[in-house]
Curated annotation (Swiss-Prot):
It holds the Pfam family Enolase_N. This is Enolase. Mg(2+) binds at D243, E292, D319. One of its GO terms (biological process) is glycolytic process. Its EC number is 4.2.1.11. Binds a second Mg(2+) ion via substrate during catalysis. It is found in: Cytoplasm; Secreted; Cell surface.
Amino acid sequence: MSIITDVYAREVLDSRGNPTLEVEVYTESGAFGRGMVPSGASTGEHEAVELRDGDKSRYNGLGTEKAVDNVNNIIAEAIIGYDVRDQQAIDRAMIALDGTPNKGKLGANAILGVSIAVARAAADYLEVPLYNYLGGFNTKVLPTPMMNIVNGGSHSDAPIAFQEFMIMPVGASTFKEALRWGAEVFHALKKILKERGLETAVGDEGGFAPKFEGTEDGVETILKAIEAAGYEAGENGIMIGFDCASSEFYDKERKVYDYTKFEGEGAAVRTSAEQIDYLEELVNKYPIITIEDGMDENDWDGWKALTERLGGRVQLVGDDFFVTNTDYLARGIKEEAANSILIKVNQIGTLTETFEAIEMAKEAGYTAVVSHRSGETEDSTIADIAVATNAGQIKTGSLSRTDRIAKYNQLLRIEDQLGEVAQYKGIKSFYNLKK
């Protein structure tokens, strides 16, 4: 009854109006699962391959009909007949069928769509919530959200190099309360921006993209919004985080961090040592608790030096640096580079490999932050993954745009369903920091 009888993929649109995949899996019992695949704007060079058609006459070359065909004509034939509950066997079968180290033959987008749909079909068959199916009876921790309320870098037209300015309600007592704090700060920030005559249109992830005078102007404006909303900045209230996305402005030939790429003539050009000094200055000055991709993805010496300098005080998250890949994470652990990993399901391409990366991180004392992509859909699977793994943190955008709010609303439902069992750890989610 739990045997897969049909697998079907179609091309749909993501939050940027670009094509992506939606996959459906059906079983003998009538149980059904659907998965939709996200897409990134700033991508690590070591990520699994997102297969696009390349036909410039259709969706500017971004069509996904090849990936759709791979699901309908190759993957479907291979996994029909499997028990839908055997997630690992199905994921391993797809990896073997692809046969490349980066899923470049079938496409990570094709494989991931199936992987998510299989898990959802299994949960439907067992008549349990997805987070419960994936995580078992010990599922209880609601994630502390990283809320990207100001967009810069590749996610907006704002003249700021850092890609994301985030708030984290670490002092809240429940996820529901944390979400309210974030929403109130978001609206307070909008009011402040209007009063300054700054743009209040939002970027890809729902954050504002105003033309601030620089990084510090952005941080100080957010701090004013926190105060205006009636909260305090710091460990008992709301803390700040950055996604520097440093690989986006790192000049490989000159080996410098060239801020002029986004901030224009006269902006800083920093060596690795100067980049670390700059980040330390910001940490000393502001209530910053997390920095993502503070160094270029291939600047291993820089990462190690940054971790030695700030690793006991601040969460240093590897996104492009680790690309949700256990090989890169294992090296980072061995060389003591970073102390946290960003988890993006489409960087690696299956739920099995995603869970392996989270488990490896936790065993090494690294934190794991489950994350969306800038090109999202209404699919809320990452909310369930965050709770299923007791990850403790989630990064899924600002307090606007349905593609972001869908994840927050799912977390509200989960917290409600868990009732008294639910835990929101807030500042304790940063369990490997010394302060």
